[in-house]
Amino acid sequence: MGFAYRIASASEYLAITGYGIADVKLAKKAWVAPGQRCTRFDISPVNYTFEVQAMSAEKLPFILPAVFTIGPRADDDDCLLRYAKLISPHDKLSHHVNELVKGVIEGETRVLAASMTMEEIFQGTKSFKQAVFENVQLELNQFGLIIYNANVKQLVDVAGHEYFSYLGQKTQQEAVNQAKVDVAEARMKGEVGAKERDGMTRQNAAKVDAETKVYTVKRQGEGAKEEARVKAEVKVFENEREAEVAEANADLAMKKAGWQRQAMVAEVEAAKAVAIREAELQVEVERTNASRQTEKLKAEHLSKAVVDYEMKVQEANWELYNRQKAAEALLYEQEKQAEARRASADAAFFARQREAEAELYAKQKEAEGLVAMGDAQSAYLSAMLGALGGSYAALRDYLMVSSGVYQEMARINADAIRGLEPKISVWSNGAGAGGEVGEGGGAMKEVAGVYKMLPPLLTTVHEQTGMLPPAWMGTLTGGAPSSTS
């Protein structure tokens, strides 16, 4: 058998297994190669109708009619793959699939109903249906199925257990009783309302009469007040008009006085202007005479001054020229000297630079030598430490001996005590002498020995340090030791 091209319809998928496919391949169209198997499965939802028998927490049975629209989840590849593996080998309308879905729904419904009382189920029907829907969906997820719609009908009594019918009768009777109560309350409200309306009518009539009297008196008072206000406004208007007339007369008098003052000022200004003009003309005449006299004097003395000025200018220019030439020569000489000093400084700088580079090179080589010496010493110490079995104390002693540290310490100590004249005293408490064998033994003998050692000890301390013992301990006389006991 050769290659075959397979195409699925709009509500179908192809499940391909076999050669070259690790698990299951889902596709809408594909080439089927030899060694492969292609299976079609429909993903359209199916309606499942059930009447689930459950029991509440009080052990009361009931029937839950339900219609579930269930199908594979087309927008999730994982769900489709699970459906293709678990459900697609069977017809979706087969008894096997029907029993599977029914078992899931009945199981979740019974578990949920067993945790609730009948009153809770009856009062919270909507929440109960939602809980059934959510729990069933969780179980169907493992088969790749999704609930498209769930229509849970009204709860029904089981034959011989009429709990819901009794609850309905109870509700109906409560509604009838509530209706009677509502009718009685409405009749009571009507009678009470009629009496209240009659009383309110009388109260409103009396209130209107009182308000009418008050309004009449109030309007009369307002009329009197308005009349007095109008009279006052008329009087104020007359006073304002009289004040405006007086103000106009005062303004007219002030304007007349101002006009007279301006006329007098104009006459005075005219007279002063004539006098000022006469003085200005006289000043012009005097200025003209002075200018003519100045020109005459300039003509007499200016020619001589001009000649003297030109001669002095020529002399100043010649002297300036000589000074400029001398300054230029001096500047040229200073520039040459500066160039010579610059060249000398460059040569000295070059020489110092070479010396610095040579010194830097020498320091670098010296540092490299120190580094090499340090590396060699490090290798030497590591080898010695290994030869001595890792004993740092033995390595230290060897290094001190090889470097002459002990010899140097001995030399320093010898230099420190050179020139000193130490006094060495040796004494004995005479415990081994025959003359003292007869003395008391034990503790008293030891105490006697200590007291005998004190005099020579104090004498030696005095000879070497010059210090005397305290008076309570003993005294030294004539260089001979003495003690008190």
From Swiss-Prot:
Domain of life of the organism encoding this protein: Eukaryota
Function: May act as a scaffolding protein within caveolar membranes, functionally participating in formation of caveolae or caveolae-like vesicles.
Lineage of origin: Eukaryota, Viridiplantae, Streptophyta, Embryophyta, Tracheophyta
Lipidation (S-palmitoyl cysteine): 38
Alphabetical keyword list: Cell membrane, Coiled coil, Lipoprotein, Membrane, Palmitate
Family matches, as Pfam families: Band_7 (PF01145)
Membrane topology: Lipid-anchor
PANTHER family reported in the protein's UniProt record: FLOTILLIN-LIKE PROTEIN 1-RELATED, FLOTILLIN-RELATED
Compartmental location: Cell membrane; Membrane, Caveola
Coiled coil: 228-320
Record InterPro entries: Band_7, Band_7/SPFH_dom_sf, Flotillin_fam
PTM text: May be palmitoylated.
Record flagged with keyword Cell membrane: yes
Gene Ontology cellular component terms for the protein in this record: caveola; plasma membrane; plasma membrane raft
Annotated source species: Oryza sativa subsp. japonica
Designated name of the protein: Flotillin-like protein 1
Assigned protein family: Belongs to the band 7/mec-2 family. Flotillin subfamily.
